[in-house]
Amino acid sequence: MKNELRKTVLAQLTSQDPETKAKIDQYLLEQLIALPAYKDAQVIATYLSFPHEYDTSLLINQALKDGKRLLIPKTYKQGRMIFVDYDPGNIVATSFGLMEPASDLAVDKSEIDLIHVPGVVFNDEGYRIGYGAGYYDRFLSDFEGETVSTVYPCQKHDFQPDSYDIPVKEVVTCK
């Protein structure tokens, strides 16, 4: 069920009209930065997006302009993930095609105020289907800060989460 839903939604995401997607991305940014969770955050973690995902460069640029400390994830084998300070001059491509920091200097998760969480499919309770590796579910299992995801309409579906799934606290979307 999850794999089929993931495949269906990924196909829809990759076939989005670029002009429409850009407008939605800007709208989602405006909704996100209006949230108290964003306004109150000093340290924000996000990710470096693939072309079919929400364009995180918009959030990155806005957060830096707003004087926020910005973190991005680095993944390791066995599902381990850390967040490190964003340094655009220190980014490398992984074997999976992800853009990640070269640095291994992890920021303690207790320092992170808000995590902008990626995903492929989301339900009304904030549960998500990611890409299947479980990095975020493991990281978020004992994270006490705020979490938010930016979601296109085609990503909203009903599904039953697994017991180990961790919901995001806020889902920002458009009609």
Where are these regions (language model features)?
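Surface-exposed, charge/polar-rich loops and edge strands
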Residues: 4, 11-15, 110-114, 124-127, ...
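Redox-cofactor binding/interface segments in oxidoreductases and associated redox assembly factors
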Residues: 46, 117, 173
